[in-house]
């Protein structure tokens, strides 16, 4: 043993203090070296093994965590002869009271004990534990007494409740009035609740109908807006449709055809333009467009017959003019029979241009050879006829009546001038035939 250990032990004995609990360990191996067991003399009753080892030895040890009892006399709760007996009330006394309250509605089936039997029961019971330690009861009433008191109270409570029920349920003529009144009140409440539910459902249906009508109106407005965005011509009036982008995309020829002022070449291209318009406008169709199309179809049906008859008449005129000019160039026809045919085959435009050309020609040009004059005149008349047919000077629509009336005096004056010239030529030819001069005939032909 070291001097340090001896010094500690001597101080512990003098001060009556045990400081070995901080380093108390218990051996886990069977091999033990020199050591010393110290039994505490204090009143705490714990067994402590204080084992000290040298620095040279190695030893597996474990700290003692649980106290151990040494004997019955060292127990801290042991009753001493000079100590005063203290009786305390245990907390388990309130448990039977709670149990009695819970069992108050149940009628007891066990007969409670009498006070005589309660006096015979011991008030305090002593028992010894398995370890020889005397266990003192700290309760004033035992569990049997608590149960008996609880049963007695529950019996009293149940009897009182039965008496109260009997007093309140006194039958009157064999009918329970309170039960009837209660059922009547419940039925009235149920009826009121049903009426309230019906009114709520009616209000809800009205509200839903209003929402439905409002949403249907909004849907109709949205459809109109979408149709206006897709077809902007519906927004503009009829007068301003000429400036709309849809109307600007339509060719000028188709516009004149729809308006009634159509020429011959535009009439030929009308079916194609109508097909393009139908494909472009097939995406957005409205009742107004359908009515307008029907009106246009009805108005155009009458003009289609005359439009298709013009090309045939024009081709016939070209054929006659070409045939007549070829015959004149080859001198196959007579001079007398040729001039009326030319006047009958050519249109008014040809006669007008020939008359103007005849008046404007210089005197020296009239003295040319008859063959050159006839060829040039025939060529100029052919060009003027083709030009007049391509430009569509002849107008047959009702919208151009005013222009036709304005042009009638001019045509009349030209025709009168032509008739005067023809009569003058015929008189000259008659005189020449009578005289037998051929040179005058050639000059007249020129």
UniProtKB/Swiss-Prot annotation:
In this chain, where does the modification Phosphoserine occur? 244, 286
User: Keywords for this entry?
Assistant: Coiled coil, Cytoplasm, Phosphoprotein
Q: Per the record, where are the segments of Polar residues compositional bias?
A: 257-287, 332-359, 368-377
Where in the sequence is Phosphothreonine found? 236
Q: What is this protein called?
A: Topoisomerase I damage affected protein 11
Task: List all membrane-crossing ranges.
Answer: none
Q: Which residues form a coiled coil?
A: 179-231
Spell out the family assignment given in the record's similarity comment. Belongs to the TDA11 family.
Q: Where in the cell is it found?
A: Cytoplasm
Region (Disordered), start-end ranges: 32-62, 252-306, 332-377, 392-446
Q: Which gene encodes it?
A: TDA11
List, as start-end ranges, the regions of compositional bias called Basic and acidic residues: 290-301, 403-421
Look up the domain of life of the source.
Eukaryota
């Amino acid at each position: 043993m070291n001097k340090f250990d001896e010094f500690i032990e001597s101080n512990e004995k003098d001060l009556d203090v045990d400081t070995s609990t901080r380093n108390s360990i218990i051996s886990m191996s069977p091999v033990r070296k020199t050591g010393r067991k110290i039994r505490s003399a204090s009143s705490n009753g714990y067994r402590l093994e204080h084992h000290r080892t040298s620095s040279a030895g190695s030893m597996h040890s474990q700290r003692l965590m649980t106290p151990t009892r040494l004997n019955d006399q060292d127990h801290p709760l042991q009753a001493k002869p000079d100590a005063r007996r203290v009786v305390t009330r245990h907390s388990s006394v309130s448990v039977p009271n709670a149990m009695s309250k819970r069992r108050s509605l149940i009628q007891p089936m066990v007969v409670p004990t009498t006070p005589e039997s309660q006096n015979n029961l011991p008030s305090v019971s002593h028992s010894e534990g398995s370890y020889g330690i005397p266990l003192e009861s700290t309760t004033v009433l035992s569990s049997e007494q608590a149960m008996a008191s609880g049963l007695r109270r529950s019996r009293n409570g149940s009897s009182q409740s039965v008496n109260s029920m009997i007093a309140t349920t006194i039958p009157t003529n064999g009918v329970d009035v309170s039960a009837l009144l209660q059922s009547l009140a419940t039925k009235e409440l149920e009826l009121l609740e049903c009426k309230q539910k019906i009114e709520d459902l009616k209000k809800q249906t009205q509200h839903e109908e209003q929402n439905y009508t409002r949403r249907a109106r909004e849907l109709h407005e949205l459809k109109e807006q979408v149709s206006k965005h897709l077809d902007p011509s519906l927004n503009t009036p009829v007068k301003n449709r000429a400036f709309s982008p849809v109307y600007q995309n339509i060719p000028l020829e188709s516009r004149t055809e729809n308006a009634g002022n159509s020429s011959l070449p535009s009439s030929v291209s009308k079916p194609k333009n109508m097909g393009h318009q139908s494909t472009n406008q097939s995406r957005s169709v409205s009742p107004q467009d359908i009515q307008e199309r029907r009106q246009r179809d009805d108005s155009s049906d009458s003009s289609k017959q005359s439009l298709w008859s013009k090309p045939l008449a024009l081709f016939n005129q070209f054929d006659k003019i070409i045939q007549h000019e070829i015959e004149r160039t080859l001198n196959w026809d007579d001079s007398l029979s040729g001039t009326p045919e030319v006047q009958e085959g050519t249109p008014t435009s040809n006669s007008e241009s020939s008359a103007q050309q005849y008046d404007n020609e210089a005197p020296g040009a009239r003295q040319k050879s008859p063959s050159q004059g006839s060829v040039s005149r025939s060529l100029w008349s052919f060009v003027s006829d083709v030009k007049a047919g391509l430009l569509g000077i002849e107008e047959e629509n009702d919208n151009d009546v005013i222009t036709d009336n304005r042009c009638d005096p001019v045509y009349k004056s030209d025709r009168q001038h032509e008739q005067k010239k023809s009569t003058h030529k015929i008189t000259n030819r008659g005189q020449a035939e009578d005289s037998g001069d051929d040179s005058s005939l050639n000059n007249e032909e020129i």
